[in-house]
Regions:
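An N-terminal-biased, well-structured beta-alpha scaffold segment characteristic
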Residues: 1-92, 194, 214
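Structural/interface elements that position substrates and couple domains in central-metabolism enzymes
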Residues: 2-5, 13, 21-25, 99-101, ...
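Short glycine-/small-residue-rich Rossmann-like dinucleotide-binding loops
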Residues: 52, 197, 203-205, 231-232, ...
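Residue-level detector of alpha-helix initiation sites
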Residues: 54, 75-78, 93, 97, ...
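Beta-strand-loop-alpha-helix segment that lines the small-molecule cofactor/substrate pocket
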Residues: 60, 64-67, 79-91, 201, ...
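Phosphate-binding beta-alpha-beta segment of Rossmann-like dinucleotide-binding domains, i.e.
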Residues: 87-89, 94-143, 158-159
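Rossmann-like dinucleotide-binding domain for NAD(H)/NADP(H)
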Residues: 91, 105, 215, 224-307
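Rossmann-like dinucleotide/phosphate-binding beta-alpha-beta segment
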Residues: 132-223
Length: 307
């Protein structure tokens, strides 16, 4: 029977279904032990992971039987895809399965930051009552700039269209928008930086996108935008982001991803209670519903692949 190794959490019903067809080893904490993964990977034809398992060249060197890697999520920066290609190992992300969850996070974070909820909350729990002292605005008719217009970027645009946002989108690989549920215009980075009141980032982490949003980018922002990042932390220069906030170049930010995860004290010590910001531990795409969709999708793909 084909052997499958699962190194991070998966929906239980999906796992039970997988066990009908494969010999499964499931250890949701195995990602923490790189040496153990390197030691045992030679036994398995299939591997199912999330974003914490590092599938490096050292792991793949020992993966003599490996034919399929299922990614319970979207980003592939934790997988040496070039080596996989050379070894003819199929890499399957769960494209689109968590798009609704991420889109909800982006819209809800945008609303919270536009309303300055983090600032109001902090003041209120301290016994203050700044009902008229702090000014907030409505989200309707704000200009949203979406950087990266793939499956998730388009889903964000769909949700944002419904609540009356104006939308600019940038993606060098998208030539036109043919979705009637989306009211958006394709644009360029310069226009997005200059005009947007909210900027949401939906890019893969590559050599091209690493540190892409930096001091130079912030210097072009004229409307004190909200910055939201649910893609990969290293796309934004975190030092430049904090600096832009303190200089009133941006009016707030929501980060679900960070250059180093878990977040380290060097960064979180810079975050003060009175800042208009939201920090979350890489959960924008992780909900009960999305976990079911992602897990079922990868289970179907790996079952189809081997049968």
């Amino acid at each position: 029977m084909t052997k499958i190794l699962i190194t991070e959490f998966i929906n239980q019903d999906s796992l039970d279904n997988l066990k009908k067809y494969f010999d499964i080893k499931y250890d949701e904490n195995l990602y923490e032990n790189k040496l153990e993964l390197e030691r045992i990977i030679h036994n398995y034809e299939g591997l199912i992971i999330r974003n914490k398992t590092q599938v490096t060249s050292d792991v793949l060197k020992n993966a003599k039987k490996l034919k399929f890697i299922g990614r319970l999520g979207v980003g592939l920066d934790n997988i040496d895809t070039e080596t996989c290609k050379n070894k003819n190992i199929h890499v399957q992300p769960a494209t689109g399965m968590n798009a609704d969850s991420v889109a909800e996070y982006v819209v809800s974070s945008s609303m919270s930051l536009i309303k300055k909820i983090p600032i109001f909350h902090n003041a209120t729990v301290k016994g203050e009552w700044p009902r008229t002292k702090i000014k907030s605005t409505e989200i309707k008719q704000k200009l949203l700039g979406i950087i990266g217009f793939g499956t998730i970027g388009k889903k964000v645009a769909e949700y944002s269209t419904k609540i009356g946002l104006k939308i600019l989108a940038y993606d060098p690989y998208v030539r036109e928008i043919n979705d009637k549920k989306i009211d958006a215009k394709l644009s360029n980075l310069n226009e997005i930086y200059e005009k947007s009141e909210i900027i949401s980032i939906h890019l893969p982490l590559t050599d091209e996108t690493k540190n892409m949003i930096n001091k130079s980018s912030f210097s072009q922002m004229k409307n004190k935008p909200i910055i939201i990042n649910t893609s990969r932390g290293s796309i934004i220069n975190e030092v430049d982001l904090i600096d832009a906030y303190h200089k009133n170049i941006i009016s707030g930010f929501a980060l679900d991803v960070f250059e180093k995860e878990p977040i380290e004290s060097e960064f979180y010590n810079k975050i003060k209670p009175d800042m208009n910001c939201i920090l979350t531990p890489h959960i924008s795409g992780v909900t009960i519903e999305s976990n079911v969709r992602v897990s079922d999708y990868i289970v179907k793909k790996i079952t189809d692949f081997f049968n």
